[in-house]
Amino acid sequence: MSEGSAGDPGHGSSRQRAVHPENLSLGSSCFSPPVNFLQELPSYRSVARRRTNILSRDKQSGTLLKPTDSFSCQLDGGITENLNSQSIRKYALNISEKRRLRDIQETQMKYLSEWDQWKRYSSKSWKRFLEKAREMTTHLELWRKDIRSIEGKFGTGIQSYFSFLRFLVVLNLVIFLIIFMLVLLPILLTKYKITNSTFVLIPFKDMDIQCTLYPISSSGLIYFYSYIIDLLSGTGFLEETSLFYGHYTIDGVKFQSFTYDLPLAYLISTIAYLALSLLWIVKRSVEGFKINLIRSEEHFQSYCNKIFAGWDFCITNRSMAELKHSSLRYELRADLEEERIRQKIAERTSEETIRIYTLRLFLNCIVLAVLAACFYAIYLATAFSQEHMKKEIDKMVFGENLLILYLPSIVITLANFITPIIFAKIIHYEDYSPGFEIRLTILRCVFMRLATICVLVFTLGSKITSCGDSTCELCGYNQKLYPCWETQVGQEMYKLMIFDFIIILAVTLFVDFPRKLLVTYCASSKLIQCWGQQEFAIPDNVLGIVYGQTICWIGAFFSPLLPAIATLKFVIIFYVKELSLLYTCRPSPRQFRASNSNFFFLLVLLIGLCLAIIPLTISMARIPSSKACGPFTNFNTTWEVIPQTVSTFPSSLQTLIHAVTSEAFAVPFFMIICLVMFYFIALAGAHKQVVVQLREQLSLESRDKRYLIQKLTEAQREVRSQPASA
């Protein structure tokens, strides 16, 4: 036997390969002609068609598709070069390979100078300190235990709503701190204040003395209910406090070594909180967009992901596990329904297409008519309330006073309650896919809720600037009805926020809890069982708090303490919604993923911020500021404080600022920004194409196993057939 083996080495080696097919040498004489076996794989052939592009990318970011045998070369080459700048934890390697990298790193440290070793050690210590600090801050998060409990019982979709509510609490607290540090704190620190120091900026001949009059309600015999009205509407004793714009009729605050410019600080605080909100929301939105971009998939991959990776392992409650099971089943049925509708759309005839588009056009006209009717009702309610508030408010009783003061808020709340029901009925006849139905309904409700605030503000603006006599024309605004129009706009925002808060509490206490009791203890009634238990609808609740946050953004300029009120309001709403969720509500069967929810929430919030910036910009740049109250009494508009401040700078700095803000600089800068934007758009398109190619490569690699098994089977047959042929 030994002779046979020695005399026929090829035969012996072939027999060994037959016993151990994984040790087959695919480049041996068994295969004629000898070729590299890996080059026959479907995935390798796909790579070969675009070898040039992949090689160019490999030089920049490392080879994506490499055999495991070349790993040692990769360790000795590209990765070891980056050990100085990147942590070993970032590499997708096993423990033994990471240990080898660590040994290489420690070996390299011995040959460095003391200065380089100290820099490496300092950088590593600083990174370790930052990681420990991040771990510590996670334990200091607001409502961390409550949100974890909600996540465990109801899943990540509802947990994302409460995390979003926590974000708004922190955001409003930061906004309040900005306003407090820039506006309130300097006033509280000193008793010396300067008033009307720059009155000469507005010549007396261009302004009537009536413009500077601000009649304050006389303090006589006041009924107790008047204090309740003042507390709910911001009038009376609250109107003269630091809650509203009219309290800050100060040009500056005098300290020992300098004078604090309060008008400039007031405007800068407004710009600062808007810019901070924008940057913070965009930053969080980009993170959510990245997750959505990574999870974007084709339809056939969606089914696999839902079946094999769709379970939420944070769920610890049995009933919630059953709900998640039904939710996954619902999502699969919805995907199949969308696929059926997609196939139905592809099979439509031209007559059916014309009929459907005609029906959609008609239904969208109805939607526009409903929106127009709501906006007109808000306009009429606001105009009626403003006209009768000053004339007949003293002659009315308690109930009539509240009705007049809160009439715009009541109409807006009714519109926000009725229109979603109408939109939900209309959308069923438009023949859209289920997913698009939800998105379009939410989009319409978002537009309705946020546009009502803008209609209210623009209605107030039209009433403020409508002039009917010479005094009004001299002042630039309707001084008779609005001697301090900024304060009255702040009062409207204050009333909207208070009324929205009252409605949320009333619905929870007087609708949700009684409904839960009826469903629990009146199970025999079919009508009550059909009514059912209240669902925790995530989109509706999100729209409610975004509506409140938009009010806060608009009203913070006219009522500087409104962010503090919003912070307290959202804190109470958190606990109220948590109790409502735990004891009165059941989650909606249409659940949201946490990543999709966070991105959707922030997108709606960003729309609200953009809509809030528009009326604020118009009020600061176009409408004349009040001459009887506020820090801008000596300026025609709020924005004029900026050029007035720039005029006090040195001439060289003024020249630089004027050059930067001129058209000669703006046009080239805009062109450069457009070029940069086009570059990033092209880069994003290239990256998208690479992602498509890599997905194709991934799907082709799934066929490699079948191909390898087929080749190994052929090799075994060929090896076994060699002795018989010999």
UniProtKB/Swiss-Prot annotation:
GO terms for biological process: sensory perception of mechanical stimulus. Its main location: membrane. Glycans are attached at N23, N94, N636. Residues 188-217, 283-360, 424-492, 575-598, 685-726 are cytoplasmic. Disruption phenotype: Conditional knockout mice in nociceptive neurons display increased sensitivity to mechanical stimuli and comparable sensitivity with heat stimulus. Also display increased chronic mechanical allodynia in DRG neurons. Also display increased proportion of PIEZO2-conducted rapidly adapting current in DRG neurons. GO terms for cellular component: plasma membrane. Residues 1-166, 239-261, 382-402, 514-553, 620-663 are extracellular. Disulfide bonds: none annotated. The chain crosses the membrane at residues 167-187, 218-238, 262-282, 361-381, 403-423, 493-513, 554-574, 599-619, 664-684. InterPro entries: TMC, TMC_dom. It is a multi-pass membrane protein. It is found in: Membrane. GO terms for molecular function: ion channel inhibitor activity. The modification Phosphoserine is found at S87. Ubiquitously expressed. Expressed in dorsal root ganglion (DRG) neurons and satellite glial cells. It comes from the Eukaryota. Interacts with PIEZO2; the interaction inhibits PIEZO2-conducted mechanically activated currents. Acts as an inhibitory modulator of Piezo2 mechanosensitive channel in dorsal root ganglion (DRG) neurons through physical interactions or interference with the interaction between PIEZO2 and the cytoskeleton. Belongs to the TMC family. This is Transmembrane channel-like protein 7. It comes from Mus musculus. The gene is Tmc7.
